Each structure stands twice: as structure tokens, then as C-alpha cells.
Regions:
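Alpha-helical protein-protein interaction elements
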Residues: 3, 10, 33, 43, ...
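Active-site acidic/histidine clusters and adjacent loop/turn architecture
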Residues: 1-39
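Catalytic cores and adjacent binding grooves of peptidoglycan-active enzymes
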Residues: 57-148
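Extracytoplasmic/secreted envelope proteins and their assembly/folding machinery
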Residues: 19-23, 47-51, 100, 104
Length: 148
């Protein structure tokens, strides 16, 4: 089970491989019941709303949902639904007695990493090119289906 801070946190579009990694991460005794998800999947419209707010100086940093990332497949934020129908990012909050460095260290064991400079809480299982390696995840490295 992946703990969320409130019912509005959407995890429905998380890639199944990412979801499995998160479940293993949250089950790890070093972080269990000490960390929760505060932001998950976003629709294009929600990402656009956050970006517009940011551009107007009324919101936090948010990626332009129309920006095509290097490599040409992913758009904008990894929180937003991508062309394959999945989302690849969550924001975490520490709710118990555990340090950021422990959270990051444990997450890395499951192939989940902070990827935005200055945002220790933003975690992804991959970048534009590939999935991050995992010491603790039984990865069977099946090729991703091509999406036109």
C-alpha cells in the first residue's frame, strides 16, 4: 500500500513498474509509516493549470506541459500523463522520525531517485532514457511497448 496525505492525491496513472517499486519502498522498515505521498499523477489540464499559475507568479515551479523533452517521447512534468498513458513521478513528505538522506538512500535501493535539483521530495523511477537501476527490485527488464 502506498500512503497518501489525502484522498485527492491521484496514483491511478502510475506506471505499474513504478507502483511496484513504491510499494516495496514504503514497506521498507526504515521508512514505513514515516513518509507519505503528497503529489502524484496529473492530467494535462492540471499540469497546464499549475504551469499557468507559476508563470503568473502565483504558484510553485511547474513544468510546461507542452514542452517536449529531449528524446522526443516525454512531455513536461513526469507527474503528468505521458503518451503511453502513465505518470512517472511522486512528491514525498516526511511524517515521522527519519532524515531526508535515509529516505533518499532507501528509495535508491528500489530504483527511485530525486531528479529535480533543489526539490529533494520529487522522486522518479526513470529519466527520458531508461529506468534507474535497483538493487532490491526484481526487475525482469522487459522492453517497453512503442507508442505512436
Amino acid at each position: 500500500m502506498i500512503p497518501v496525505v489525502h484522498s485527492r492525491v491521484d496514483l491511478t496513472l502510475l506506471h505499474p513498474k513504478f507502483k511496484e517499486r513504491l510499494e516495496l519502498f514504503f514497506g521498507d522498515g526504515r521508512v514505513a509509516n514515516k513518509v507519505t505521498v503528497v503529489s502524484g499523477c496529473r492530467s494535462y489540464a492540471e499540469q497546464k493549470r499549475l504551469y499557468t499559475k507559476y508563470r503568473a507568479g502565483r504558484g510553485n515551479l511547474a513544468a510546461n506541459p507542452d514542452w517536449k523533452r529531449p528524446g522526443g517521447f516525454f512531455y513536461g512534468s513526469f507527474h503528468q500523463e505521458q503518451p503511453d498513458g502513465y505518470s512517472y513521478a511522486v512528491d514525498l513528505r516526511i511524517t515521522g522520525r527519519v532524515s531526508r538522506s535515509i529516505v533518499t538512500s532507501v528509495a535508491r535501493r528500489y530504483g527511485i531517485r530525486p531528479t529535480v535539483k533543489g526539490e529533494w521530495w520529487h522522486f522518479q523511477p526513470r529519466n527520458e532514457n531508461d529506468w534507474f537501476p535497483s538493487v532490491s527490485f526484481p526487475d525482469n527488464d522487459q522492453p517497453e511497448p512503442a507508442v505512436d
